[in-house]
From Swiss-Prot:
The encoding gene: DBP4
UniProt protein name: ATP-dependent RNA helicase DBP4
Signal peptide interval: none
PROSITE patterns: DEAD_ATP_HELICASE, HELICASE_ATP_BIND_1, HELICASE_CTER, Q_MOTIF
Entry text on domains: The Q motif is unique to and characteristic of the DEAD box family of RNA helicases and controls ATP binding and hydrolysis.
Helicase ATP-binding domain span: 80-256
Record's subunit section: Interacts with the U3 and U14 snoRNAs. Associates with pre-ribosomal complexes.
BP-aspect Gene Ontology terms: rRNA processing
Bias (Basic residues): 697-710
Compositional bias (Basic and acidic residues): 522-531
Assigned protein family: Belongs to the DEAD box helicase family. DDX10/DBP4 subfamily.
Record's compositionally biased regions (Acidic residues): 715-730, 786-795
Known function: ATP-dependent RNA helicase required for ribosome biogenesis. Involved in the release of U14 snoRNA in pre-ribosomal complexes. Required for pre-rRNA cleavage at site A2.
Organism whose genome encodes this protein: Phaeosphaeria nodorum (strain SN15 / ATCC MYA-4574 / FGSC 10173)
Catalysed reactions, semicolon-separated: ATP + H2O = ADP + phosphate + H(+)
Length: 803
């Protein structure tokens, strides 16, 4: 017997390699045991309450234990055993009942038993989600459960990320969580991405994925997938259409519905109410509700992204006292992730959202779900209200219904087992924000434009609804609704106008009498040939703002009519709405000097301002023109030039330079006489001014002389004061002065002179000599400056100048 850990070789086997070999053997044994246990599993007769009762692998058990999942929910108790056996499943359960784990666990276990691991194995499971947020949430749950020992390579495919980086990593993936659009893009464009070995296909929120919105993408994806696979479908409102099931190639699917026999299709802990609220009172009611629920977590649903943005921006300016957030499909992916993270972690917050947040998202502890706009159908209502009352937690849902929507919507809710009770709003608690919205829209054109787009998108969504019994557009008071948004007038809706024109056209056709068939039809006039020069002269100037923006921002309900004449003077037949570009200012070539400041030359959306002091009105048709009204300097250029007037002795005004008429000029006499008179008058004026100038100069000279004498007198008095007579004390002043001078010299000698700075290593004696010579020359120059008095001084001066 050899030593432990020693093989036939002389060197011992590495401990790490030996451990990996032993682990591989244990995995093979575990897989065999799991296969046998799953074969003996009986989903129909067996009772399974805990996850420990199921034949699961150790990594999955550790992941469930780490996430504190021990007891299975109703949908998990029925769906997981069937999925482990390899059956196709149609799973339906209420919102918040744990459907995500119902397909995450079978995906991990089935691939683990098949040992579908590694880059060579290829893609084993594909999970499709209708929204990016739900896909991210599923991927997070997959990572939490599978990170405790599973060796699968999992990936997330959603829009908004680098396509090239995903393309490089795709061939190594074993499990993918994706949205249909991104998945189809890689299947059609990434050559190295193969799905021939796919074992499982999972569709979360399957009814939404299989509807018209994703029909083409899903059909194209299924064409790439192999026919032999396991398919799992889960949703709160499951589809049983034979056409949908045939598209997915399901083989004897098991329909699992744990709440089909319940009295309600929604959780029992969910309290559901509805309010009869006309369109014009919806925002007032919503604002009052938010003011009364500042300590709650609220989720508000609208039908369009424009409505979400408008309500968010307007409410944010009014500061309701609770954090506001908004999410919609037109946001970038980073902003959407930040919003969902903030709302999930917040205790008190209000999130305005579209249906992008209606399915699958798990926001913890949501107190209220408010549906301001009526949902498209009952399934949408169930998914929206399912964001609260999750995992047996209490929650409340409030639905706003217009009077015309009440009867039809309640009938459909009752048919789907959704109990809803009516409640009333106290009028004392309701606050009107109509005036505040009007003020904000007046001050901020961008907010006004956003409100108009919100109005149009809401009307369009109602117009396109299939259920005309619930959504009756004629029953809505659109003018009052537009006023409640703060808009000065009702925006024009193009498709409504087209419907009216079609009705008028059909009515007129019925009243027209059919002419006799024998009558010959009048020959149609041939259209004239239009050259490129004709098209060039028919061009219109581009406006500063887009056409649709100006149409919406213009106040009032009046139609914008087309200009009366075109460039050539002929009458136009198309209205302003049919033109691609509107005419900003059109000037005919023959009438260049005409006045075009009137209202006829104003472009759609423009206005005319009459300025005081200006003969021509100012046309405001752009932001630059609007800012011009605030600049006094620029406005003065538009004013008429003023005239300076001079008044005569009688008080009559005259211009500074007035031209005489020929008759007045002749009445004054001959030109030679007038010239002589002018010269004499000018000479008198000059002589008078000369006398005044001489008197002024004489006075200045006298004043200058007086000031000089005063200054000399003051200097003489100062010299007299300084001459002080010395007192005779009998002492010799000269001797005292010499003694003091000798004493000061001794003191100066005793003072220690400062030490001279030491030389550096790079300095030489020549530098000191040069400095001393410079000082001598400087001293000599200072001595030269003094005025010489004797012959010696003059010689010193000459020597200094010469050298």
């Amino acid at each position: 017997m050899g030593a432990p850990g020693i093989t036939g070789r002389t060197r011992p086997t590495k401990v790490k390699k030996q451990a990996s070999q032993q682990k591989r053997k244990r995995d093979d044994v575990d897989v065999e045991k799991l296969e046998q246990a799953v074969t003996e599993l009986d989903p129909k007769t067996g009772t399974y309450n805990d996850f420990s009762d199921l034949p699961l692998s150790d990594p999955t058990k550790q992941g469930l234990k780490a996430c504190h999942f021990a007891v299975m929910t109703d949908i998990q108790r029925k769906a997981v055993p069937l999925a482990l056996k390899g059956h196709d499943i149609l799973g339906a359960a209420k919102t918040g009942s744990g459907k995500t784990l119902s397909f995450i666990i079978p995906v991990l276990e089935n691939l683990y038993r098949l040992q579908h691991v590694g880059a060579d194995a290829g893609l084993g499971a594909l999970i499709l989600s209708p929204t990016r947020e739900l896909a991210i949430q599923i991927f997070d749950v997959l990572c939490k459960i599978g990170k405790h020992g599973h060796m699968f390579a999992a990936g997330l495919l959603i829009g908004g990320k680098s396509l090239e980086s995903e393309r490089q990593a795709l061939p190594r993936m074993n499990i993918l969580v994706a949205t249909p659009g991104r998945m189809l893009q890689h299947l059609s464009q990434t050559a190295a991405f193969l799905v021939d070995d796919l074992k499982m296909l999972v569709l979360d929120e399957a009814d939404r994925i299989l509807d018209m919105g994703f029909q083409r993408d899903v059909d194209a994806i299924i064409d790439y997938l192999p026919k032999e696979r396991q398919t799992l479908l889960f949703s709160a409102t499951q589809s049983k259409k034979v056409s949908d099931l045939a598209r997915l190639s399901l083989q004897d699917p098991e329909y699992v519905s744990v709440h089909a026999e319940d009295k309600s299709a929604t959780p029992k802990s969910l309290q559901q109410n509805y309010i009869i609220c006309p369109l014009e009172e919806k925002l007032d009611t919503l604002w009052s509700f938010i003011q009364a629920s500042k300590k709650s977590k609220i989720l508000v649903f609208f039908s369009s992204a424009k409505a979400v943005r408008f309500v968010y921006e307007s409410f944010r300016h009014m500061q309701p006292g609770i954090p506001l957030l908004h999410i919609h499909g037109r946001q970038k992916q980073g902003a959407r992730l930040d919003t969902t993270a903030k709302f999930s972690s917040a205790k008190n917050s209000c999130l305005f959202a579209t249906d992008v947040a209606a399915r699958g998202l798990d926001f913890p502890a949501v107190d209220f779900v408010i549906q301001v706009d009526c949902p498209d159908d009952v399934d949408t209502y169930i998914h929206r209200v399912g964001r609260t009352a999750r995992y047996n937690r209490e929650g409340r849902g409030v639905l706003f219904l217009a009077p015309s929507e009440e009867e039809g919507m309640l009938k459909r809710l009752e048919a789907k087992k959704v109990p809803v009770e009516a409640i009333n709003v106290r009028q004392k608690k309701r606050q009107s924000i109509k005036e505040q919205l009007q003020n904000m829209c007046f001050q901020d054109p961008a907010l006004k434009y956003l409100g108009q787009k919100a109005f149009m998108t809401y009307v369009k969504s109602v117009y396109l609804q299939k259920d005309k019994e619930v959504f009756q557009l004629k029953e809505y008071d659109l003018e009052a609704f537009a006023a409640s948004l703060g808009l000065p007038g009702t925006p024009r809706i193009k498709f409504l106008k087209d419907d009216n024109s079609k009705q008028k056209k059909q009515a007129s056709r019925q009243t027209i009498e059919v002419s006799d068939s024998d009558e010959e039809e009048a020959p149609k006039a041939e259209k004239p040939v239009r050259t490129k020069y004709d098209r060039m002269f028919e061009r219109k100037n581009q406006d500063v703002l887009a056409e649709h923006y100006k149409k919406l921002v213009r106040d009032g309900d009046e139609e914008i009519s087309a200009p009366a004449n075109d460039f050539s003077g002929e009458a136009t037949t198309n209205g302003a709405d049919d033109d691609f570009l509107a005419i900003k200012r059109r000037i005919p070539a023959d009438d260049e000097d005409e006045d075009f400041g009137g209202e006829a030359s104003v472009a759609p959306g423009g206005r005319v301002v009459h300025l005081a002091g200006a003969s021509q009105p100012l046309i405001i048709d752009s932001n630059r023109r609007e800012k011009l009204l605030q600049s006094k300097k620029k406005l003065t250029k538009l004013m008429d030039r003023g005239k300076k007037l001079v008044y005569d002795d009688d008080g009559n005004p005259h211009e500074v330079y007035e031209l005489e008429t020929e008759a007045d000029f002749k009445a004054k006499g001959l030109p030679e006489h007038q010239r002589q008179k002018f010269i004499e008058a000018a000479r008198e004026v000059v002589q008078t001014a000369d006398v005044e100038d001489k008197a002024t100069a004489r006075a200045k000279r006298k004043e200058k002389l007086r000031k000089r004498k005063e200054r000399e007198r003051g200097e003489a008095e100062d010299d007299g004061d300084e001459a002080v007579e010395l007192e005779d004390t009998g002492e010799n002043p000269l001797a005292n002065f010499l003694a003091d001078a000798q004493y000061t010299d001794d003191e100066q000698e005793e003072v220690e002179q400062p030490k001279k700075k030491e030389k550096k290593w790079f300095q030489s004696d020549s530098e000191d000599e040069e400095k001393s010579s410079k000082k001598k020359r400087k001293k000599a120059k200072q001595q030269v400056v003094e005025e010489p008095e004797t012959l010696e001084d003059m010689e010193a001066l000459a020597a200094g100048l010469l050298g």
